[in-house]
């Protein structure tokens, strides 16, 4: 009697794929739910008045959190609009592709590295201060406080907004530009009739996305806040546990942060998401006609200013790092120990993230029920509701009732970083998996190829490059993480970001600059590997 082949088999049998996806969702639910449960139990049975912690300090911190996020979002998008418009108009601008690649780097850089780059340009001993001294107008800019936070957030988010706007520009039909050229429209008329309608549709989702990134910004505010007046909710959570060890205060702050995050995600869902094509946008747009000389000059100036704003802090990291005593730094055992620890934790987190993401993607493809498939599809993204510092705070409070939380530090760092990388890994893996499944499912079913044989012979060649991309991206995110390690780090567990923060705290600025260069090179190398894998995958697809 001939066995009937399974209709869908790829990573494993059809019955086990939804089970594997369910286990991946259970991992995320346990991580987030355990933190929430710990916070709820602490609030309900901790022997303190929960309402008393919702005092003027908490509301002041919450107001500053919202204020700095609103200001950062509006300024980032405001500066991004003319830069994106200029880059789109100057389709043949020399180095346009290089600028777009440069604009992808701030998100790849660990926040701590970028902060050091910003201080090397705008700090009291930075480039601007040196230039003003040379011109005979000495100044000592104060980078710490709201000014430094805004400068750093614009550095991170303005390039992101530019790339998202360029993706929106790609949706404009060629006929619109052709008609504008035939009618002899000026720059203002083109902006009012063609550019602005597209920009206006993208603004709500784009501002919401940048606002979300700024609200959950931890490292930037921790290093550039400069005092109690410039403290956000996440930094206050860290301070209440790490310095004051006040779980009651941490619980109140965490619930406030969680409520704010949920509200932002709800607004994002109602306003819509910005297009994601801008993350890989490198195509040259088609334009009819050419800008006038004055408009072209303006475009070149705008592009140059945007380029300098992003390039100078990155160059500052390189220059400052090279001026450090790298030979002495690399001769220290603690530095190599931190590098090895970071690589080991990053490798483990990336491997776990890719494995769990594959389980979710396979379960979604194998499930016929649309609702269940949607749960598998969106399950990974829901973890973003809880910032890493919130998850870390919950588990820190829970673990202290059973064991020393610092003993569990490696496990917590790996699991939290893996969970935070999963939404991005799923987004990278899903298209390749679905394409391979649509091509091979029927043939494999007819030939009876299933289980490990299908994974080895059919699926793996199709998903190898996307897996490499997801692994490199997840490892880069984990290498630069400071949120979880800031709570669980100790002398027994030192990563590169944690060691860098320690050297900054002890005012060993040259050592910090050298460590920042090492960390930045590691993360950028991983992102370049992921980017090259993406390019190779695209070339193979076109062939």
UniProtKB/Swiss-Prot annotation:
The reply to whether Transmembrane figures as a keyword in the UniProt entry is: yes
Gene Ontology CC annotations of this record: plasma membrane
User: How is it placed in the membrane, per its record?
Assistant: Multi-pass membrane protein
Ranges for domain ABC transmembrane type-1? 62-266, 339-530
Which Gene3D superfamilies is this protein grouped with?
A: MetI-like
- Keywords linked to the UniProt accession: Cell inner membrane, Cell membrane, Membrane, Repeat, Transmembrane, Transmembrane helix, Transport
Q: Tell me where in or outside the cell this protein is found.
A: Cell inner membrane
Tell me one GO molecular function of this protein.
Answer: transmembrane transporter activity
Q: Name one Pfam family in it.
A: BPD_transp_1
In the record, biological process GO terms are:
thiamine transport
Q: Which cysteines are joined by disulfide bonds?
A: none
Complex formation: The complex is composed of two ATP-binding proteins (ThiQ), two transmembrane proteins (ThiP) and a solute-binding protein (ThiB).
Q: Of which family is this protein a member?
A: Belongs to the binding-protein-dependent transport system permease family. CysTW subfamily.
Q: Which PANTHER family would you find in this protein's record?
A: MOLYBDENUM TRANSPORT SYSTEM PERMEASE PROTEIN MODB, THIAMINE TRANSPORT SYSTEM PERMEASE PROTEIN THIP
Q: What is this protein called?
A: Thiamine transport system permease protein ThiP
Lineage of producing organism = Bacteria, Pseudomonadati, Pseudomonadota, Alphaproteobacteria, Hyphomicrobiales
């Amino acid at each position: 009697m001939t066995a009937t082949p399974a209709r869908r088999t790829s990573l494993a049998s059809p019955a086990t794929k939804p089970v594997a996806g369910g286990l991946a969702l259970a991992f995320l639910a346990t991580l987030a739910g355990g933190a929430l449960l710990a916070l709820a139990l602490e609030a309900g049975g901790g022997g303190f008045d929960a309402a008393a912690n919702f005092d003027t300090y908490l509301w002041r911190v919450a107001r500053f959190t919202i204020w700095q996020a609103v200001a950062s979002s509006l300024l980032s998008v405001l500066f991004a609009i003319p830069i994106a418009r200029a880059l789109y108009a100057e389709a043949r601008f020399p180095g346009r592709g290089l600028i777009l690649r440069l604009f992808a780097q701030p998100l790849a850089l660990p926040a701590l590295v970028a902060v050091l780059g910003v201080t090397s340009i705008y700090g009291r001993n930075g480039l601007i201060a040196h230039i003003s001294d040379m011109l005979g107008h000495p100044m000592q800019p104060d980078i710490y406080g709201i000014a430094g936070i805004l400068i750093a957030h614009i550095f991170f988010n303005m390039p992101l907004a530019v790339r998202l706007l360029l993706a929106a520009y790609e949706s404009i039909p060629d006929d619109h530009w052709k008609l504008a050229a035939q009618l002899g429209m000026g720059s203002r008329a083109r902006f009012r009739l063609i550019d602005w309608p597209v920009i206006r549709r993208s603004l709500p989702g784009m501002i919401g996305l940048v606002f979300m990134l700024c609200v959950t910004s931890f490292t930037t505010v921790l290093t550039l806040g400069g005092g109690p007046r410039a403290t956000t909710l996440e930094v206050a959570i860290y301070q209440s546990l790490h310095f004051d060890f006040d779980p009651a205060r941490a619980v109140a702050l965490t619930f406030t942060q969680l409520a704010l995050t949920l509200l932002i995600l709800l607004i994002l869902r109602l306003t819509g998401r910005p297009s994601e094509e801008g993350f890989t946008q490198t195509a040259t747009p088609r334009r009819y006609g050419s800008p006038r000389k004055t408009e072209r000059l303006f475009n070149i100036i705008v592009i140059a200013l945007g380029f300098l704003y992003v390039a100078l802090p990155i160059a500052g990291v390189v220059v400052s790092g090279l001026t450090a005593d790298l030979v002495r730094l690399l001769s220290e055992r603690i530095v190599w120990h931190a590098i090895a620890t970071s690589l080991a934790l990053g490798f483990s987190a990336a491997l776990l993230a890719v494995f769990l993401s594959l389980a979710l993607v396979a379960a979604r493809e194998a499930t016929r029920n649309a609702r269940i498939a949607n749960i598998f599809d969106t399950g990974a993204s829901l973890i973003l509701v809880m910032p890493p510092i919130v998850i870390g705070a919950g588990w820190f409070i829970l673990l202290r009732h059973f064991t020393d939380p610092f003993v569990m530090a490696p496990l917590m760092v790996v699991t939290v970083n893996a969970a935070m990388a999963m939404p991005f890994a799923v987004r990278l893996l899903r298209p390749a998996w679905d394409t391979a499944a649509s091509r091979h499912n029927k043939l494999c079913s007819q030939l009876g190829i299933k289980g490990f044989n299908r994974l080895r012979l059919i699926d793996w060649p199709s998903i190898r490059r996307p897996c490499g991309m997801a692994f490199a991206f997840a490892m880069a995110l984990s290498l630069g993480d400071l949120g979880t390690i800031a709570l669980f780090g100790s002398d027994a567990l030192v990563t590169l970001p944690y060691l860098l923060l320690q050297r900054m705290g002890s005012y060993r600025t040259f050592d910090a600059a050298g460590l920042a260069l090492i960390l930045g090179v590691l993360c950028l190398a991983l992102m370049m590997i992921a980017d090259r894998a993406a390019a190779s995958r695209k070339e193979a697809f076109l062939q």
